[in-house]
């Protein structure tokens, strides 16, 4: 598919590249010196000539000769003329029969005969929606095909005509439906006579004639002024030549020191000090917008040498924005490294002096040695040059620097020939001096004369550029649905143009022709029409067959691709562990999940610090060990660019496909491929594999002699005899799940007269071993479980004590404490004072956060659900480690670990022993009870009732000793329910750690008392990392790295600064690194701001960890739904927290805030919605977006807003007014007054009016009956129908005895970002680093208070 996306040149020798720029775009001239300002103003045309490439290009300035006109041509008229339907198009027609005229008729017939069999045999129903096309463009300009329409849209043509107004008026196009079922579209040039006959004169022609006359006059004036200016310049130059010719004629001489200084012009950055590199890098950084990567050029050290930039300025300008946008971490191509071309050929012809040769060789030697010493070096990419090829489909390659990969080909050489070229070339003074003409007389023209000449040349070029005529070009763009064009469709382009299918995702088999002019015969481009399988290297223009360069062979499956057949002395494992899969940083999708093919030079190599192996860099690849860009990949490719350059390079789907192209790594057909013991021979190449691999679930031994199961045995080759005291034995056993493979089982043994001890590693003398009833029993008073957690490892991430014992448990010292047996040595146990024992603590009532997210049942009359915690601690002991003695098992494992240990070995150690050990902890017993209240109102009423009933009567009013939890438990047990059923929704959930002593009355329970219970671990006060027990600094650093990887990168990547560099295996299905997962944010109602009828405040805790994933933005979605079972057909409104809310670009109804939680490092973001509808069901959704474009899982809050506000006093007044109007005889005017009054109030107010009317005047008749009697059935129905809008929840609240209105004023932090994010950024910025200014404001929230009695 990638090869189908490349744009190709249609004819032999046609090499147009890129999209042609239609329209004339003169730039502003450079500012001249003040003496020439008047003359410069005279030469300028009166109006400014600006011809930008805008959408309204047809409205050019009148003095500009260029015009740009865009015409859209619909295919609907041609389709209507046909006798077939839209969905049943015939596909068995020829593609060009009858369309060509003159010399092209024969070629059209040939196209028809070639296309008819393929198109008639379209497969099944897919061919019914396809259409044969025949597009012919006789004018210069390309034909583009884009499948950007839906299947229900009609195709159409777009013509972009660029040229003079007269030329554009001669462009003619027509479309028709041919008899054979082909849609024919033809663009041609009409003559002036035909145009005059076919087109009536318009009102614009006289004005254009006047403009043409003024244009000729302007040209004449300009020509005269230019001639005068040139005459003055010649006279000035002659005067200066006469005056200064005799003054300075001596030849400048140079000293030996100067020549030595100029001996070498460029020194690679590796030979510079780190300060010099950083200073030069910072100076270059000021001219770029990218915060990720900065291009670094080699540093010139000449003082009097004029350094010339040899890059192509237009090409560089076109791509600077893309490089800054993608934040490329690779450097640009260096002018001083490996530049092919004429300078290199000339340099190789002329040999330098012997001293110069020695200097260069010494520099090269130092340069290579610095690589071997892991010195950070940057190797620049090669400048790609145009290469000659016999393939008519290949064009010049655009010089880009994307992600540090550049597929440059030297002129006249193939990919294999580039392997032998020298990568580094140093230019010496002897070579550079050819440009300066040593020994000649100094020019007599000084700076003033040069300035005059430069300014005159600029003015002359500008004036001549203004008068240049614009050639006529017509770009034809065909917009079609996907899978629309049938096989056999034909395209005819003029010579110098091409067919652009770069955006065509599903190309068909085409016939492509080109012609020199309208009457010349058509020439078929067999190479250009290979859209689905374009040739990778060479293409025969006569037959269209693909071939390969020397050293390459056609792929056995895909014949249009080439694989390398000659690799020289390439043996051993593939070393590129740092090349990872590319992905699209913009969309966050795997586009493409490719590994690019490169050519390699075996003559050079370098050491990569990150891979710990010697690698051979590709010719076109820049390996930059200094790159510390915060991205998980070193290769990033844009999908469009990959398709465009498929002719110069191809790719493989996976890295295994790339490695397989190198051929087998071993011959496994005989002698197990040379693999020893139980290694298995694998002929396929793999990353960092020599072909000898271990069976599944086994790992190699330390010395690499065999494979063993590290979970069931020891390693005798670890350098410490496997931890055995005497013998370490090995045994080869077959694997139970694979009889063809085996494992090496290793265990400890003892020599004669010794026996293996119970620990399995040490040995005991047989004379010291006592067995039988006569032997003394060991002392059973030792307690090896009390405070045992202090001797084991602890995982600080999972908060669990591990099974592995770190410290040895001995009982040599008399370590006793009251009521306990002898304790292990090294434990210091301190009982806490009596005042801290048996203390009950009741927390403040807080909103239940677990019930403020998801599907929320909120009652504004009762308030938030609340929660309180009751905790009692007793039998408390503070335990510390006074002295430590490492256990034998832990000591043996530490001996095995080295700085070369793999991350998996260290992670296995952490999994068994943990990451820390406990240095200080609190032991005892604890009773914790959580009290859940259904609402805030219930909690307040129960607390008031508790205070009232547990207080003695009298003036002192001292509280009794009964705790609140005991009082509530008594209510729940005895079911002492009050009139308002307060206790019905209260729940108490308790959890006990250890046993409560009988001396504590707050936690003891009948029948479960214990005088001196065993204390358990309650709280860990201080932990110490295990790596502090490691002596070797290298091993300690490796353990730290593995520990950080397990903490932040899931053990599948390395921590670099504050981000994770994922392994090759830590990529998800979409190609994005997932070793540092993006947590799910939890959206909830703000616990401090309860919702009202129109205002809802939401908040969430920032999920960005300290290391790893970086959150770029949070996306909020809110919509109003009818029921909880929403079908999600209405998506609602999406808001970006960073771009819409913090920037202030959103609506005034939504505001953003930010605050800090109990821990300052934790940020809490909040959003307040102000313009919601009362009694409406709303659904709010939140997800996070990281800097790679990944989305987290959704968090949802569904909530019904509070009931509408009502004025109870006004409702009662309206009820009285309606009663007075209904009372007695009701005239027509009174009826209308009553009707208008009831229709003007809201539905909730009408419900409240009905409540007051019935409560006061129901004895005179119900409100419904009285309204029907007084107003009539029709008007009464219109009024009473509005009561149906009130929900059942609000109708129950509106029946309350009293409703009071109040306004709560709540402080809220309104935040705005100080910086503006630039539009179209590819690299997402980090939200936490955004500078935010917050201002505290008061938010007024009107509420209703419902009750059975009037509030105070």
Swiss-Prot record:
Q: Which residues are glycosylated?
A: 180, 796, 1033
Q: Where is this region: Disordered?
A: 1-31, 308-327, 375-421
Q: How does it assemble?
A: Interacts with ASTN1; the interaction is not calcium-dependent.
The record's function comment reads: Mediates recycling of the neuronal cell adhesion molecule ASTN1 to the anterior pole of the cell membrane in migrating neurons. Promotes ASTN1 internalization and intracellular transport of endocytosed ASTN1. Selectively binds inositol-4,5-bisphosphate, inositol-3,4,5-trisphosphate and inositol-1,3,4,5-tetrakisphosphate, suggesting it is recruited to membranes that contain lipids with a phosphoinositide headgroup.
User: Which cysteine-cysteine pairs are annotated as disulfide bonds in the entry?
Assistant: 527-539, 535-546, 548-562, 668-681, 675-692, 694-707, 716-728, 724-748, 750-763, 838-1000, 929-990, 996-1003, 1049-1060, 1062-1075, 1149-1171, 1203-1290, 1311-1334
- List, for all copies, the residue spans of the domain called EGF-like: 523-563, 664-708, 712-764
Protein name per UniProt: Astrotactin-2
Taking the first listed entry, what is the main subcellular location of this protein, grouped into a coarse class?
Answer: membrane
What the entry lists under Pfam families is as follows: Annexin_2, ASTN1_2_fn3, ASTN_1_2_N, ASTN_2_hairpin, MACPF
- What is the membrane topology noted in the UniProt record heading this document? Multi-pass membrane protein
The species is: Mus musculus
